[in-house]
Amino acid sequence: MHILVTNDDGIHHPGLAALRDGLARDHRVQVVAPDRERSAIAHAITLLTPLRAFSQTNGNGIPSWAVNGTPADCVKLGVLELLGEKPDLVVSGINPGPNVGVNLNYSGTVSAAREAALLGIPAIAVSVSNPYGTHFSDAARFMQDLVADVAERGLPKGVFLNVNLPDVPMEEIAGVRICRQGIARLEEAFHVRKDPRNQPYYWQGSETQLFGESPDEDGVALRENCIAVTPVQCDMTDYGFLNQLKEWKVEKP
């Protein structure tokens, strides 16, 4: 199978290297990834400046390009221009730090997989729970098996998989849980400081993760030491509310 590997942490990140090398054992792999860290950039694409792709070399001879754009740019440019042919699958990761709950909306890792799904290509985003991830090889081993399942069974149109693994040795993981996107999110916080001119500036972020309680949520599964596998759809329409909204009879003024 022909696989495009990408991420949002940059082409030299060890998580990408573990994923690339693991998948290359059984598949034809090419890499198109950002030339630098582009985390939490969501589904941004570059329209006002040109994109540039620089061919990279690595010890295993896998064709690779570093792009001065976003993760979504990398998928779009790779599929439409760089690879020469449409890949069978796009895999984004391995991201250090979880992408569960509300944080799917901010994630460049997840958005790269979403871009592939929008282009009609099956895709998987994969992350480990630790922002300073150390068990990328275990995650890559799991992905080899999951990729084989996707190759055999396929994915519905407009749907991709979001995978989160505990950052522990594989033998310590409790199991695999198929689950829904939950409500987990980082606790909202800004750290206010002063610059040398006594003007305030703000660092956004917190490492406190707020989880739900339902065992079928992705964040709860991860907290309970399970691998969380979630099907995510690109169509964001709320069909349950659609007909109710039509009853509002909204009209132009």
UniProtKB/Swiss-Prot annotation:
GO terms for cellular component: cytoplasm. It catalyses: a ribonucleoside 5'-phosphate + H2O = a ribonucleoside + phosphate. Its cofactor is a divalent metal cation. Binds 1 divalent metal cation per subunit. SUPFAM superfamilies: SurE-like. It is found in: Cytoplasm. Transmembrane segments: none annotated. InterPro entries: SurE, SurE-like_Pase/nucleotidase, SurE-like_sf. One of its GO terms (molecular function) is metal ion binding. It holds the Pfam family SurE. It comes from the Bacteria. A divalent metal cation binds at D8, D9, S39, N95. Belongs to the SurE nucleotidase family. Nucleotidase that shows phosphatase activity on nucleoside 5'-monophosphates. PANTHER family: 5'-NUCLEOTIDASE SURE (PTHR30457), 5'_3'-NUCLEOTIDASE SURE (PTHR30457:SF12). This is 5'-nucleotidase SurE. It comes from Desulfatibacillum aliphaticivorans.
